[in-house]
UniProtKB/Swiss-Prot annotation:
Database matches in Pfam families: TatA_B_E
InterPro entries with a match to the protein in the record: TatA/B/E (IPR003369), TatA/E (IPR006312)
Location of the region described as Disordered in the Swiss-Prot/TrEMBL record: 45-76
Membrane topology type: Single-pass membrane protein
Domain of life, per lineage: Bacteria
Protein task: Part of the twin-arginine translocation (Tat) system that transports large folded proteins containing a characteristic twin-arginine motif in their signal peptide across membranes. TatA could form the protein-conducting channel of the Tat system.
Gene name of the encoded protein: tatA
Subunit (UniProt): The Tat system comprises two distinct complexes: a TatABC complex, containing multiple copies of TatA, TatB and TatC subunits, and a separate TatA complex, containing only TatA subunits. Substrates initially bind to the TatABC complex, which probably triggers association of the separate TatA complex to form the active translocon.
Entry similarity comment: Belongs to the TatA/E family.
Protein name: Sec-independent protein translocase protein TatA
Length: 76
């Protein structure tokens, strides 16, 4: 109905190849791949930083809790 058929898609791909050339498209594809790889790496690095920060905060809270328990025992 309103969708793109296979033949229309092939015609569009052929026109794009004729306009830009295969070398330019290959370069564009590799640049796009490197961009995606860099984005994924940045996301992974961000998650590692957040995990380290969370661990640091949880260690601090455990230390504070132990200190408060010790103070409560001394007061009792």
């Amino acid at each position: 109905m309103g969708g793109i058929s296979i033949t229309q898609l092939l015609i569009i791909v052929a026109i794009v190849v004729l306009l830009f050339g295969t070398k330019k498209l290959r370069t564009l594809g590799s640049d796009l791949g490197e961009s995606v790889k860099g984005f994924k790496k940045a996301m992974a690095d961000d998650n590692k930083e957040k995990d380290a920060e969370f661990k640091s905060l949880s260690d601090d809270s455990e230390t504070t809790a132990k200190t408060e328990k010790a103070k409560d025992k001394e007061q009792a």
